[in-house]
Curated annotation (Swiss-Prot):
It is found in: Cytoplasm. The keyword DNA repair does not apply. Its EC number is 2.1.1.177. Homodimer. This is Ribosomal RNA large subunit methyltransferase H. One of its GO terms (cellular component) is cytoplasm. NCBIfam families: PRK00103.1-3 (NF000985), tRNA_RlmH_YbeA (TIGR00246).
C-alpha cells in the first residue's frame, strides 16, 4: 500500500478544516497509509528584512527536511511549480507506483515559502493554481485531490 506523508508548517486552528481533513483521511484509509506532520512555524513579525526572511525559511526548512528519508519521493507545493489536471495528477501518482516509489511526501511550506534546501530536495514542484491559498486550507485541498486521484486510478465514480 502506498505511504503518503504530508509535512506542513504551522498548526490548523479552524475546526471546519480539521473536520474536513479528518473526513478525507478516513476516506483515504482504503487506498493509502497516511501520515500528517505539523512543523512549528517560526515567529514572523509583519516586516522582516530579506535576511530575516531567509533565516525563518532556513529554520522551518530544517524542520521540514528532518523527517524525510532519502528514498521518499518529495513533492513540494509551490506557486512556481507545474500545474496538473486531476486526471494528470492521478496518472502521475500511478507512474510513481510503477517506478517503485512506495513512499511519497508532500511538503507545504510556511507563509514566507521554503528554503533553497527544501526546493533542492523536492523531486517535483506542484502548483495548485497561480492563486494564493491559506496554508491550512491547502492541506484539505491536497487530501481531496489525493482522494480524487485514487478514485480516478481505480476507475471508481467520483471525478466529475
Amino acid at each position: 500500500m502506498l505511504q503518503i506523508k504530508i509535512v506542513a508548517v504551522g498548526k490548523i486552528r479552524e475546526r471546519f478544516l480539521m473536520e474536513g481533513i479528518k473526513e478525507y483521511a478516513k476516506r483515504l484509509s482504503a487506498y493509502i497509509r497516511l501520515e500528517m506532520t505539523e512543523i512549528a512555524d517560526e515567529p514572523c513579525p509583519e516586516r522582516l528584512s530579506a535576511a530575516d526572511e531567509e533565516r525563518v525559511k532556513d529554520r522551518e526548512g530544517e524542520r521540514l527536511l528532518k523527517g524525510i528519508g532519502p528514498q521518499e519521493h518529495v513533492i513540494l507545493l509551490d506557486l512556481q511549480g507545474k500545474e496538473f489536471t486531476s486526471p494528470d495528477f492521478s496518472e502521475y501518482m500511478d507512474e510513481l507506483a510503477l517506478m517503485g516509489k512506495s513512499s511519497v511526501t508532500f511538503i507545504i511550506g510556511g507563509s514566507l515559502g521554503v528554503s533553497g534546501e527544501v526546493r533542492k530536495r523536492a523531486d517535483y514542484r506542484w502548483s495548485f493554481s497561480r492563486l494564493t491559498f491559506p496554508h491550512p486550507l491547502m492541506r484539505l485541498m491536497l487530501l481531496e485531490q489525493i482522494y480524487r486521484a485514487m478514485r480516478i486510478s481505480k476507475g471508481e465514480p467520483y471525478h466529475k
